[in-house]
Amino acid sequence: MKTFPVSIVTPDGPVYEKEVEMVSVKAESGEMGILPGHIPTVAPLKISAVRLKNGGHTDYVAVSGGFIEVRPDKVTVLSSSAEEANHIDIHRANEAKRRAEQRMQDKQAHVDFKRAEMALQRAVNRLNVSDMK
């Protein structure tokens, strides 16, 4: 099967750069599957896992939202943070989840509930992706 290059990039630099046969992402408008030769598209992403298939192997990368740019010959994902499944520190992700849950339960006026909720979603996503190794 044909392959195409995929780059997942954060402000700190590239996180994933490989040739793949298919990319699956969760866009704000729904699930997208991208194969070689896909029409050009730009879409905002949800906090989710990016699935990258090549042969019988699938890589998973946790992204904290961002955008996907699809060209017929290349796909680029831009995200504020991204981690490959095998690089996720499970202890750190569990701690982040615990802190976010605590902030949400405190219900104090100075707590930004939406930020705590987003932090919880990011931590849960990282834990889910780490289980996909």
UniProtKB/Swiss-Prot annotation:
Q: Name one Pfam family in it.
A: ATP-synt_DE_N
State whether keyword DNA-binding applies: no
InterPro entries from the entry? ATP_F1_dsu/esu_C_sf (IPR036794), ATP_synth_F1_dsu/esu (IPR001469), ATP_synth_F1_dsu/esu_N (IPR020546), ATP_synth_F1_esu_C (IPR020547), ATPsynth_dsu/esu_N (IPR036771)
One GO MF annotation is: proton-transporting ATP synthase activity, rotational mechanism
Q: Where in the cell is it found?
A: Cell membrane
For the keyword Cell membrane, the answer is yes
Which keywords fit this entry according to its UniProt record? Answer: ATP synthesis, Cell membrane, CF(1), Hydrogen ion transport, Ion transport, Membrane, Transport
Topology in the lipid bilayer? Peripheral membrane protein
Q: Which GO terms describe its cellular component?
A: plasma membrane; proton-transporting ATP synthase complex
Role, per record: Produces ATP from ADP in the presence of a proton gradient across the membrane.
Q: Which family does it belong to?
A: Belongs to the ATPase epsilon chain family.
The entry describes its oligomerization and partners as:
F-type ATPases have 2 components, CF(1) - the catalytic core - and CF(0) - the membrane proton channel. CF(1) has five subunits: alpha(3), beta(3), gamma(1), delta(1), epsilon(1). CF(0) has three main subunits: a, b and c.
- Entry protein name: ATP synthase epsilon chain
- Supply the source organism for this entry: Bacillus anthracis
Taxonomic lineage: Bacteria, Bacillati, Bacillota, Bacilli, Bacillales
What gene does this protein come from?
atpC
